[in-house]
């Protein structure tokens, strides 16, 4: 018996978790915010909104800006960060983060509201990595949930 084999090249390509923030504005006011999964791995997404009053010279005002209220049931807030509850497949997008356009009354004189959207994604599998990295749970349906605290 004689075994004769030639080398076989196995090509493996790692999955990627890449996202793109998509915003729509209405008269310069952010009215819709989505996050699109441009990677190859199903991923979870979280977003932080940084709101500042900015004057005509680009200086940030010391006046605090309250965070906008998010009431979309596909998102939940934990420590100022909004988590999309559903895993986002490749080339898919989250639901709109905003229920209403972001507006803030009572701007300091000479200032306008500037909203910066910061987003982050993490590969959905293994779910333990999501829990360890972000401190949120993945339920039996694959949805993100806030961790429960017991007194």
What is each of the regions a protein language model found here?
Residues 1-151:
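Long, small/polar-residue-biased beta-strand-and-loop interaction regions
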């Amino acid at each position: 018996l004689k075994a004769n084999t030639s080398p076989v090249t196995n090509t493996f390509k790692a999955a990627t978790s890449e996202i793109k923030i998509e915003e729509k504005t209405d008269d310069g006011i952010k009215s819709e915010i989505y996050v699109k999964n441009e990677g190859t791995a199903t991923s979870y997404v979280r977003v932080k909104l940084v709101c500042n009053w900015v004057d005509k010279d680009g200086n940030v005002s010391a006046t605090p800006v309250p965070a906008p209220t998010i009431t979309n049931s596909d998102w939940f807030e934990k420590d100022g960060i909004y988590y999309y509850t559903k895993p986002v497949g490749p080339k898919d997008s989250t639901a709109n983060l905003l229920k209403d356009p972001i507006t803030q009354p009572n701007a300091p004189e000479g200032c306008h509201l500037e909203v910066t959207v910061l987003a982050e994604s993490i590969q959905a599998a293994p779910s333990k990595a999501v829990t360890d990295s972000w401190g949120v749970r993945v339920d039996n349906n694959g949805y993100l949930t806030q961790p429960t605290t017991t007194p």
